[in-house]
Structure formats: structure tokens, C-alpha cells
Regions:
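PLP-dependent amino-acid enzyme catalytic core
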Residues: 1-167
Length: 167
């Protein structure tokens, strides 16, 4: 498979049989094979595209999100590829690896005090949004499109890949 757009390879991850390890018919979805390395690529793409479809996110706007890591990586991957300025806000004590990945994807990073946990990041996003109406805050923790991504995509893939043989 050759693709011009990395977003085309988010999702459609394989089902992996764990029978050799467990002796049972247990399967796992290989979401770690998404380009950002986690299931969060799928929800990031879904939340951003749903916001675009509703008109909540338009060209020229900035995508902002508070995260401790993997969702920020997914949002950076998707948002930057779609041409948006992406700003990720996270506590300063998150791993250097995550910070470097987010920056390498082209997103900006704002670090908040680790003593404020994720709440500090949420407050900073609210402060930034109040100053600039052209900021779209994803709000993964409250966003109904987050779980809907799995209902509309992950579940359908599992059903199809397992040919309906699920108990």
C-alpha cells in the first residue's frame, strides 16, 4: 500500500489472535499500529473531522488540547497534517519523549506546573480560548465524539474482522 496522506492509515488495524499465549480464543485489536502508536490516533481523527463537519473547526483556526500524552500525539498528527496550527497543553512533568514527539509532529507545546496536574492545563486552555475565538479546544474528556469514534469505527471493524463471531 502506498499513500500520500498518513491519515489514510489510521484505523483498520488488525485483530491479533492471542491463542498461542493463552490457549484460548482471545483476540486483541492492534491499535498500536496506528501511525502515532496508539488508539488515540483514531479518536483524534474522528473528533477533529466531526468538528469540521459541524463547522466548529474551520480553516485558519487553531486546535488546542490538554493532555498527558497519547491524545496530544494523535491531535498533533491529525491537526498539523490537515493544515491547522496545533497547540498542546500538558503538565511539565510528562515524559520528554512525549514532548519531543509532539514537537516533531509540528505542534506547539505549552507546559503547566506539574503541581496543578491536568487541571492546570485545562485552565490554561480556557484562558487561551477566552482571548482568541479562533481556537477550537478539543476537550477530549467531555467530547461525545471521543467514545462515538469507537462506536462508529472500532466496533464496526471488530465485527467485520471477526465475521460476527463475537461472544
Amino acid at each position: 500500500m502506498i499513500t500520500e496522506n498518513i491519515l489514510d492509515i489510521i484505523g483498520n488495524t488488525p485483530m491479533i489472535s492471542l491463542k498461542a499465549m493463552t490457549g484460548l480464543d482471545i483476540f486483541a485489536k492492534g491499535e498500536y499500529l496506528n501511525p502515532g502508536g496508539s488508539i488515540k490516533d483514531r479518536v483524534a481523527k474522528f473528533m477533529i473531522e466531526a468538528a469540521e463537519a459541524r463547522g466548529d473547526l474551520r480553516p485558519g483556526m487553531t486546535i488546542m488540547e490538554c493532555t498527558s500524552g497519547n491524545t496530544g500525539i494523535g491531535i498533533a498528527l491529525v491537526g498539523v497534517r490537515k493544515g491547522y496550527r496545533v497547540v498542546i497543553i500538558m503538565p511539565e512533568n510528562m515524559s520528554e519523549e512525549r514532548k519531543k514527539i509532539i514537537k516533531s509532529l509540528g505542534a506547539e507545546l505549552i507546559l503547566t506546573k506539574s503541581s496543578e496536574y491536568i487541571n492546570g492545563a485545562v485552565c490554561e486552555a480556557a484562558r487561551q480560548k477566552a482571548m482568541d475565538p479562533n481556537i477550537f479546544v478539543v476537550q477530549q474528556f467531555e467530547n461525545p465524539d471521543n467514545p462515538l469514534a469507537h462506536y462508529k469505527t472500532t466496533a464496526v471493524e471488530i465485527w467485520d474482522q471477526m465475521e460476527g463471531e463475537i461472544d
